């Protein structure tokens, strides 16, 4: 947190930690309490149906604490709109987001990234292929893909998040590949042959950054929270950075 964020959160009479679009490790939650004071964790329903928060904010100061970039989620943009409608003062304090850290720590050049992709948990027999289709589109345009892993197997945003493991994410990509092949789609590269960089527990003491083929990365399930970069054709500097991060 920036000094501004700490000062503002500490000064608010009411503090809520939003616990479903991103998460803090338990030890970081304890540290947050030490830094800004006590807070209450709230999940998706209370943020998407924010009448309680809005009523509180009419007459008192409220801090909604969000891990990373506070305005990356549509829910938070909608909350700003609701405050504007009700003439409730709304201020944004920028945070450091894992998505920007992932790009810089990957060793790949930021201007060569295409559209960001999220791999969702499959719900029953439903498995969309659009995430892999976007990865292929980026790849065919020689653009790298930053891939975020789902946190919520239920899709409801009510229970404590359960971060997706690399093996699960890559297995889902391979199932998407199978569905595309069944439909007769031409694929530019097998999922197992993609080269990528797994970023684990970014900014924590346990941070690890490792590169290799998807078949290698799928075996890396240590750590807690992961994201993945699938690389397109790399230039010399990128290729050297990739080699320095190789799985050993």
Positions of PLM-derived features:
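Class I S-adenosyl-L-methionine
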Residues: 1-89, 93
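Conserved active-site and cofactor/substrate-binding residues in soluble primary-metabolism enzymes
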Residues: 4, 27, 44, 48, ...
């Amino acid at each position: 947190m920036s000094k501004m964020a700490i000062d503002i959160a500490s000064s608010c009479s009411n503090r809520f930690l939003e616990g479903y679009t991103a998460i803090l490790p338990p030890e970081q939650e304890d540290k947050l309490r030490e830094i800004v004071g006590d807070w209450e964790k709230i999940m998706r329903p209370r943020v998407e149906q924010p009448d309680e928060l809005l009523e509180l904010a009419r007459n008192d100061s409220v801090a909604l604490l969000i891990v990373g970039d506070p305005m990356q989620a549509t829910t938070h943009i909608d909350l700003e709109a609701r405050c504007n409608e009700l003439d409730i003062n709304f201020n944004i304090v920028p945070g450091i987001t894992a998505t920007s850290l992932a790009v810089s720590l990957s060793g790949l050049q930021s201007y060569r990234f295409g559209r960001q992709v999220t791999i969702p948990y499959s719900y029953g027999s439903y498995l969309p292929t659009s995430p892999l289709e976007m990865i292929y589109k980026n790849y065919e345009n020689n653009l790298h893909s930053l891939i975020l892993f789902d946190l919520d197997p239920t899709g409801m945003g009510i229970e404590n998040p359960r971060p997706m493991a690399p093996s699960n994410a890559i297995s889902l990509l391979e199932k998407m590949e199978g569905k595309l092949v069944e439909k007769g789609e031409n694929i530019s590269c097998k999922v197992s042959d993609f080269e990528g960089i797994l970023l684990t527990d970014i900014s924590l003491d346990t941070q690890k950054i490792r590169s290799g083929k998807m078949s290698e990365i799928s075996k890396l399930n240590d750590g807690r929270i992961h994201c993945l970069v699938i690389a397109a054709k790399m230039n010399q500097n990128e290729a050297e950075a990739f080699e320095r991060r190789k799985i050993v």
